[in-house]
Structures are given as C-alpha cells and as structure tokens.
C-alpha cells in the first residue's frame, strides 16, 4: 500500500515537471517578453486544475440513479411524441380517404371523370386544415359481458324466478276484494268488483265508464244507513273497501251513485262559508258581487297557505242528550281540532271553552227524519260518529241547526277542518276529470256533426229541386202525350171531312204557298211579346174572313222541322185573316154540326206540329191548352162571315186572361 502511494506521488511529480517544461517552451516561442507578473500565470493554471478536480469530485458524488431516471424520462417522452405523430398521420390519412371517397362519389353522380376527382382531392388536401385532436372523454368503460352460466346456476335462477312469481301471485291473492252493488237514481243497480287498493275516485271513474254520464264534479258515492237514518258522501280519497268492511253482514246499508251539490259547494262559492259570518249585510252584498278572480284568491288564501284556514263558525245549536230524546241549546264554536262549546256561566274565551268532540276518528253524516224519530227541534241535523259504530250508541253525537244554510256551513266546515288541503286536491282532480270528459264529448259531437252536415245539406238541397223538377217534367210530358194523342185522333177525323168535299181541297194550299212567309216567326214574336199579338190580314178570297186562333193556343213548332219537311204544307191563307166578330162555339159542339151544315173546310193544317214541341219552348200551363187547337182550325173556315163586336171583346178578354195566367206561372 505504501509503495503504490509512492508510485502515484512520483508520477504526479513527473507530470508536473513535464507541464513546467511545456509552459516554458511555449512562452519562449510565442509569447512576448516575459510579463512582470509570472506568478499570475501559475495561479491561473493552478486554479483551472483545481476546478477540474472539483468537477471530477462532483461527478463522483452525483447519484447514478438520478441520471438513469432522467435518461428514462427523456426516452419515454421521445416515445410518446413518436406515438402522437403516428396517430396524427393515421387520422390525416383516414380523413383524406373519406374526403376522397365523398368527392369521388359526388363527381361520379354528376358524371365527371376520374381526373377531375383526383385534382379536386389534391386541391382539398392542400387547402384543408389539420383535423382537431380527438377529445378525451372520461366515460366509464362498458360492463363486461356476463359470463355464461353453468347448468346448476341456470336451474337456481329459474327456481328463484318461480319463487318470485309465486310470491307476487300470493300477494295479489291476499288483496281484499268485494263485489259492490251500487244503486242508481233510476232504481237500477250496477255491480262492481272493488279491491282494497281502489279509492272512491277510482270507483267513480269506473261508474262514469259504465253509465256514460257527464263526469260532473257533483257526482259522488253516497252512503246510507237506514237503521240510524244517517247518510253521507264518500270523500274521493277514501278507501271504499275499508269503509265497507265496517258494515255488518246483515246490514241494510246502501251505496248510491248520484249528484250532490253540497260535495264541493265551498269551492264554487267560498264566500258563503268564509265571509258569511263576518257581517250579514256586508256578506250579502259581497256574495252578490264576488267574481271568479276574487273567489280564486280566497280559495288560494284558505287552502294554499302554510296552514289551512278553517271557516269561523260559531252559534247556538241543539244538542241531543245521551240516551234521551231531549235537546239542549248550547253555543258551539268550530276550531281546526274539533268542536267546542261554552259551558254555563262562562265566556267565549279560549280558556273557558270545553271540548265537545275531536275530528280525528269520526265521520260527519246528515241526519234524516230526526224530528220524527228523536223529537229534534228541526229536520236540519248532522251526526258525528266513529266509522265502526253501526247501531245505536251513546258515542254518537247528534246536533240540530235552525236552517239548511247553517247545516251546510257546519258540515262543510267540519270537512275542511278534518281533511284540509286533501279536500281541495280532490276537487281539482274532479275538475280535471270533468274537463277532460267534456273535451272528449265535444270532440265526439264535432266529429259526428261534421259528416252529418254534408250528408243532410245536399240531401235537402237536392230533394227540393228533385221534388219539383220531376213533377213539372212529368206533367209536361203527360200533357204532350195527351196532346199528341188528341192530335192523332183529330187527324183521323180531318181526312174524313176532306174526302166529302174534294173540289174545295186543292185550291187553298197551293195558291199562297209561294207568297206567304212561313208562320214560325209570327208565332215566335207572339210568344215573346207580353201582350197578345194582332194577327195579320191575308189577301185571301171570300167575303167572310175567318178568325185565326190566337197564337197563345198554338204551340210554336221549331223552325227546322216545318222548313225542311216537304210533307208539311204551309198554313192556309185564312190563318192570317183578322179576328171575326163572333166567338166560335167550343169544339165538342162543332163535331155534330160539321157533318150536316158546314161547307167543305180547307185542307187540314199540319197535325203533328204540337208533338215535336220541346219541353223548354213553353211553360207547362200554356202547353196544357194546346189539345183543342186542331178542331178550331178545321171548322172555323166553314162559317159565313160577319159577327158582333161583343164576341170580339170576349175573345180579347180570354186572351188577356190566358196571358196573365202564363205570366203568373212563369
């Protein structure tokens, strides 16, 4: 050990000597003349070597573990950067691929080539910014899928399910159920299955469905005790099965389904219960002037506050003594906890009041016929008793009021004190039910009336015209058929008359054929004119002019048939002669005269003219007068000329009457 230290010292001294020689050689060659301060250079060298030694010592003292930790941290950071760069490159590739696919599909749908798509893709890749990094969501991992159960576990699970189902069925079987017979106000009954989970509101809803009534808020279940002669209505929140369970097996009690305005009268007119006792004169005026807004505010103040406000009721009532039929008059006060009375010789202060009954375990009932049964002062009684008391008992309290108004106020006040806000909630639920039912009813009536209007409207509109037009058409067609038949019969008679007088036949039709205009224009003008047309005078032969029948008697033939038909000759010249001075007798009387006295008549006029007359040419009354026309035109020419003026006046009056009738009909 001593030798090694000596060797080190020797080596160190040798090194120092060599360093001195080196510095001397460098100073002789390069440096200027020696500096007056050579010891400073030695100091610098000695200082530098000292710093080197200190740095070496510091390196030796430094912890290698810390260096390794730093190195590992640098390596991990580099790896993270590499992984991040790879992710970004993959995202860019996916984004560019999706963009390329969308652009290519759009270009393909528009009919562009692949070159355009490629250029568009490259352009979009250059212009688009890099996609944002995926947000890191701290979402819980989905639960692992359940492991498949073994056969034993499946059997155990199935057994547990069966046990659970059996327990549910057992629980359902334990639910108490009753068959309730509900009496209607028309003496009919409805049977309902009611279980212990149903409230009176549920039973009412079932009855609404069965009876199809209007779901008014006044409908209620009404409980009647014939033995005690008391009755009441169920509150909507009461359990029906619990109440019916208190009845005895041989009871005569009944449940009715009827309307009672007293059930929710306080919510319709709250001023009658809250403001009635503050002043009789003021309350009457207030009751008359109370509007809906004030009623609503009064209800909110009474039922929607921190505590329920019970009506301030107090007054003298008659109390039935226990076990007796005698009644005593006492002064009672209504409070939220019960009814109190003022003992004899005491005041109405709270410390002097005595508790009469509390509302916790009693129900309120109306008394019926208590004046007859219990010798009550009036028939306006109410009763307070426990629900389980079904027969006469000393624990039943009977009170009697002076009038119906006082009775209703006390009964409603007791209900408000007993049920509180629940009563208001029941009313709101009943109103909502009634409003929903009314909306459905209105919707049903609107839907039912909508198809009825178009069905009845056109029906009535069509029946009136169809009832009139067919009748008119039928009458016109019947008249035309009758006229045609009459014309055919007269046509059969006309050739017979013409055969007897052949020499006179050919003269009349051929002479005026070319000179006279066709008659239809004259007839048409007479048709359209309001007054009878004046017939034109024809230049015919013969001294006596025969009268042409008025145009009103002749149906105007349509223009085409008489012009185009060569078989129909024009009317005779005598047709246009002035009216005669006499009125020809009716056609039936001429039939016998024509065969013996009359000269040969001219050829018959065209008989089928009345047949083709259209229905719209003339009104039905004018057409009805057409049948007698052919006989007049045949037989008038045979009369000698000359007639009186009185007959002409008669003819003109007849024409005016017919024209007036036509105007009334049209």
Curated annotation (Swiss-Prot):
Residues 176-263 form the Ras-associating domain. Widely expressed with high expression in thymus, spleen, lymph node, bone marrow and peripheral leukocytes. The modification Phosphothreonine is found at residue 528. It comes from the Eukaryota. The modification Phosphoserine is found at residues 55, 526, 531. PANTHER family: AMYLOID BETA A4 PRECURSOR PROTEIN-BINDING FAMILY B MEMBER 1-INTERACTING PROTEIN, GROWTH FACTOR RECEPTOR-BOUND PROTEIN. Keywords: Cell junction, Cell membrane, Cell projection, Cytoplasm, Cytoskeleton, Membrane, Phosphoprotein. Residues 122-155, 448-666 are annotated as: Disordered. Pfam families: PH, RA_2. Interacts, through the N-terminal Pro-rich region, with the WW domain of APBB1. Interacts with RAP1A, PFN1, TLN1, VASP, VCL and ENAH. Residues 129-148, 547-589, 598-631 have a biased composition (Pro residues). It is a peripheral membrane protein. Belongs to the MRL family. Appears to function in the signal transduction from Ras activation to actin cytoskeletal remodeling. Suppresses insulin-induced promoter activities through AP1 and SRE. Mediates Rap1-induced adhesion. One of its GO terms (cellular component) is T cell receptor complex. Signal peptide: none annotated. Residues 453-478 have a biased composition (Polar residues). Residues 310-419 form the PH domain. The gene is APBB1IP. This is Amyloid beta A4 precursor protein-binding family B member 1-interacting protein. InterPro entries: GRB/APBB1IP, PH-like_dom_sf, PH_APBB1IP, PH_domain, RA_dom, Ubiquitin-like_domsf.
């Amino acid at each position: 050990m001593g030798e090694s230290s000596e060797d080190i010292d020797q080596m160190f001294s040798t090194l120092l000597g060599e360093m001195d020689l080196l510095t001397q050689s460098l100073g002789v060659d390069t440096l200027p003349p020696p500096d007056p301060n050579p010891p400073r250079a030695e100091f610098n060298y000695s200082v530098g070597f000292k710093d080197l030694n200190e740095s070496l010592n510091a390196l030796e003292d430094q912890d290698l573990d810390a260096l390794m930790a730093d190195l590992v941290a640098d390596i991990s950071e580099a790896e993270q950067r590499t992984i991040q760069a790879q992710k970004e490159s993959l995202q860019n590739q996916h984004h560019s691929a999706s963009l390329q696919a969308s652009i290519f599909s759009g270009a393909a749908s528009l009919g562009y080539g692949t070159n355009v798509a490629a250029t568009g893709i490259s352009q979009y890749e250059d212009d688009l910014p890099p996609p944002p990094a995926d947000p890191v969501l701290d979402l819980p991992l989905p639960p692992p899928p359940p492991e498949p159960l073994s056969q034993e576990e499946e059997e155990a699970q199935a057994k547990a399910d069966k046990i659970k189902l059996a327990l549910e069925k057992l629980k359902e079987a334990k639910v108490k159920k009753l068959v309730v017979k509900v009496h209607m106000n028309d003496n009919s009954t409805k049977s309902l299955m009611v279980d212990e989970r149903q409230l009176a509101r549920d039973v009412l809803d079932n009855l609404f469905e069965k009876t199809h009534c209007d779901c008014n808020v006044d409908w209620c279940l009404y409980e009647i005790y014939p033995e005690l002669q008391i009755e009441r209505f169920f509150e909507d929140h009461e359990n029906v099965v619990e109440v019916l369970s208190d009845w005895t097996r041989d009871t005569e009690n009944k449940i009715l389904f009827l309307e009672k305005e007293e059930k929710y009268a306080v919510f319709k007119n709250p001023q009658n219960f809250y403001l009635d006792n503050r002043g009789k004169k003021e309350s009457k005026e207030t009751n008359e002037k109370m509007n809906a807004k004030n009623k609503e505010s009064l209800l909110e103040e009474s039922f929607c506050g921190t505590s329920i406000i019970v009506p301030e009721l107090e007054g003298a009532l008659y109390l039935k003594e226990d076990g007796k039929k005698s009644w005593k008059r006492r002064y009672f006060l209504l409070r939220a906890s019960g009814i109190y009375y003022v003992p004899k010789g005491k005041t109405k202060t709270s410390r002097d009041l005595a508790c009469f009954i509390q509302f916790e375990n009693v129900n309120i009932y109306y008394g019926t016929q208590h004046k007859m049964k219990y010798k009550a002062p009036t028939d306006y009684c109410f009763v307070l008793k426990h629900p389980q008391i079904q027969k006469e008992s000393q624990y039943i309290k009977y009170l009697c009021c002076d009038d119906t108004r006082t009775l209703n106020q006390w009964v409603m006040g007791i209900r408000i004190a007993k049920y509180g806000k629940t009563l208001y909630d029941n009313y709101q639920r009943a109103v909502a039910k009634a409003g929903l039912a009314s909306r459905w009813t209105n919707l049903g009536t609107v839907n039912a009336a909508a198809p009825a209007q178009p069905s009845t409207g056109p029906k009535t509109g069509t029946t009136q015209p169809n009832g009139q037009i067919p009748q008119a058409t039928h009458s016109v067609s019947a008249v035309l058929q009758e006229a045609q038949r009459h014309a055919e019969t007269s046509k059969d008679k006309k050739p017979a008359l013409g055969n007897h007088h052949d020499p006179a036949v050919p003269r009349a039709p051929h002479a005026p054929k070319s000179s006279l205009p066709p008659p239809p224009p004259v007839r048409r003008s007479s048709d359209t004119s309001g007054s009878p047309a004046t017939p034109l005078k024809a230049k015919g032969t013969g001294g006596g002019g025969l009268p042409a029948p008025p145009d009103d008697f002749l149906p105007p033939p349509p223009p085409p048939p008489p012009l185009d038909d060569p078989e129909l000759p024009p009317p005779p010249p005598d047709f246009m002669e002035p009216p005669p001075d006499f009125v020809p007798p009716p056609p039936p009387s001429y039939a016998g005269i024509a065969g013996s006295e009359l000269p040969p008549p001219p050829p018959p006029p065209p008989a089928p003219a009345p047949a083709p007359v259209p229905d719209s040419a003339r009104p039905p009354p004018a057409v009805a007068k057409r049948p007698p026309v052919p006989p007049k035109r045949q037989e008038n020419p045979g009369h000698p000329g000359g007639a009186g003026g009185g007959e002409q006046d008669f003819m003109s009056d007849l024409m005016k009457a017919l024209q007036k009738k036509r105007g009334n009909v049209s």
